[in-house]
Swiss-Prot record:
Pfam families in alphabetical order: Disintegrin
Entry superkingdom: Eukaryota
Protein name according to UniProt: Zinc metalloproteinase/disintegrin
Span of the annotated motif D/ECD-tripeptide: 75-77
Cross-referenced PANTHER family: ADAM A DISINTEGRIN AND METALLOPROTEASE DOMAIN, DISINTEGRIN AND METALLOPROTEINASE DOMAIN-CONTAINING PROTEIN 28
InterPro entries: Disintegrin_CS, Disintegrin_dom, Disintegrin_dom_sf
Summary of the tissues where the protein is detected: Expressed by the venom gland.
Protein's cellular compartments: Secreted
């Protein structure tokens, strides 16, 4: 488990592999960083980068709106789609009251 940003009590240190308050990313020192989306000297996303990880992030850019990021698991679930504005894959499901799984879902 990664610690929460708020769990770290010392001042933020760029290059310690922990994303702390004020940092977008932290991939270690400039000599060791292998993250093409992160500027290791500033712990900020590189110019033009929108994201660095997530099911809706591809090569430092958000995947297009409507791109499937997770398939439906059953008839009560729906395929999850990227918004084009976030690296997160939001969970979609049938609305409450919608019959599914032989009215057991």
């Amino acid at each position: 488990d990664e610690p929460l940003k708020t769990d770290l009590v010392s001042p933020p240190v760029c290059g310690n592999y922990f994303v702390e308050v004020g940092e977008d990313c932290d991939c270690g020192s400039p000599a060791t960083c292998r993250d093409s989306c992160c500027d290791a000297a500033t712990c900020k996303l590189r110019q033009g980068a929108q994201c660095r990880e997530g099911l809706c992030c591809d090569q430092c850019r958000f995947k297009g709106a409507g791109t499937e990021c997770r398939a439906a698991t059953d008839e009560c679930d729906m395929a999850d789609l990227c918004t084009g504005r976030s690296a997160e894959c939001t969970d979609r499901f049938q609305r409450n009251g919608q019959p599914c799984q032989n009215n057991n879902g």
